[in-house]
Amino acid sequence: MTSWLSCFSPVSLAAGLLCCSPSTISAQELQAKITINHAQISGTEKGVFDNLQQTLQQFVNNRQWTHLQFQKNERIICNFNITVTKYDRDQNLFTCKALIQANRPVFHSAYTSTLYNNVDDNFTFRFAEYDQLEFNEQQIDNQLTALFAYYAYLIIGIDLDSFAPKGGEDILQRCMNLTNNAQNLDYPGWKAFADDRNRYAIISDYLDGALEPFRQLQYDYYRKGLDEMANNAERGRTEITAALETGLKKAKENRPLSLLPQIWTDFKKDELANIYRGKGTQKEKESIYELLFSINPSQNKYWDLVKE
């Protein structure tokens, strides 16, 4: 990525947009791959699942979700792996769970890093074959479009946070507004305080002032840390250590019941182990090990690698 993202100003998103060539600008922000796994459903024509997949992929990828301008090679790579566990043909009702993943390229490198990876166990919606999807941000009355709009805003907001401190604030606020407007939808996953890992809890925590260190972590870890490692691995790792010891640690201290630090370390476990394994001082490695273990002891086999 060598256009506006490479000249991103921490103080102004607009300044970065000036770097774009009009001939290469694309309005769409996402490049999503939608996968529908319906192996658990027997005796049903697969046409409805194929049509659902095609309709969703067009809906997500062809829509301009924000006012921002992305070049084609800057679109955020993301995946929605939807597993259908129950299908009621008469009601057009799909009961599903979904794995949502988004990636971010690392500057001056062929490496891509995971921005977000989490399972939504309440991915239930209605869809009839050949339905046309329309989305009105001001009137949330369709569960399927609300689900994908939620994750579109969440992914774009997190991505922007990784290029400027709280750079995704406006987009994440739109995600929160959508979630508030979805409270009247008769589907699980939206309700405030019903579940500490549902859609409401995730976006509410991202915008919680007590978790601002977690937001800052996104910039410090990616932009100051990973993006620096191709030029100077030692300096990049030092920045990552500082990001973890301030942003991640402070977020856990400020909101010990928030699951954001745990979710983040769940999908960062391999990357973190590789960053520190066989590298850095023993003091640095011990400090990072203790921090990661205190946040997510279930991944201790990966944290043990940090100390090697």
Language model region names:
Residues D90-S204:
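Acidic/His-rich structured neighborhood in mature extracellular/periplasmic domains
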Residues M1-E29:
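Bacterial Sec-dependent N-terminal signal peptides
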Residues Q57-W65, G157-D161, A273, R277:
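Sec-exported extracytoplasmic/periplasmic mature domains
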Residues T35, Y222-E308:
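A cross-kingdom marker for long, charged
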Residues A39-K46, E134-N142, N254:
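Second-shell loop/turn segments in exported
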Residues Q28-T95, V106-H108:
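Start-of-domain marker
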Residues A164-L257:
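Flexible, glycine-rich surface segments
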